[in-house]
């Protein structure tokens, strides 16, 4: 299965992606991990990404798209993948659609993990990260809302919404149900 996971910071995407990847036998592809791996291994794309990150700039979509395209072409992703943290914009969603279409593939599902802002604030403040001040958290949630609302509309046909409040196992069961598993 080829799945995209959407949801605000603190919704549990990474945790659920790992569980789904294990259950479905496909790789969990996180753009954060892709950047780290390519930078650590000093690949051509990693060296280029590092220049932007070191300057405190956003990595351009074209570079992120290239990293994702390279990753989905690897053998372990031939039967599917779970994307976490990508796409983040309609532009990236269209690029992903083009990548898949060029391989005669398409997405099987897009899952949105939905959590109230109060619950997210509570979760993120409870993580104890230095950069998780209420102001920073609220800004990250606003950025997510502003960027993601158009994505939810873009993926309307494939979109499955999952209530992400509850135990890890409860949310996992809902995600599997959304996938018809």
Swiss-Prot record:
Pfam families listed in its UniProt record: ADK
Pathway: Purine metabolism; AMP biosynthesis via salvage pathway; AMP from ADP: step 1/1
Gene Ontology process terms (BP): AMP salvage
Binding residue positions for AMP: 31, 36, 57-59, 85-88, 92, 129, 140
Keyword Kinase listed: yes
Stretches the record annotates as LID: 126-132
UniProt KW keywords: ATP-binding, Cytoplasm, Kinase, Nucleotide biosynthesis, Nucleotide-binding, Transferase
GO cellular component: cytoplasm
PROSITE patterns (alphabetical): ADENYLATE_KINASE
GO molecular function: adenylate kinase activity; ATP binding
Binding residue positions for ATP: 10-15, 127, 166
Region (NMP): 30-59
Domain of life (superkingdom): Bacteria
Compartments (UniProt record): Cytoplasm
Catalytic activity from the UniProt record: AMP + ATP = 2 ADP
EC number: 2.7.4.3
Recorded domain comment: Consists of three domains, a large central CORE domain and two small peripheral domains, NMPbind and LID, which undergo movements during catalysis. The LID domain closes over the site of phosphoryl transfer upon ATP binding. Assembling and dissambling the active center during each catalytic cycle provides an effective means to prevent ATP hydrolysis.
Protein family: Belongs to the adenylate kinase family.
Primary role: Catalyzes the reversible transfer of the terminal phosphate group between ATP and AMP. Plays an important role in cellular energy homeostasis and in adenine nucleotide metabolism.
Subunit structure: Monomer.
HAMAP family xref list: Adenylate_kinase_Adk
Protein known as: Adenylate kinase
Organism whose genome encodes this protein: Mycobacterium sp. (strain KMS)
Gene name as annotated: adk
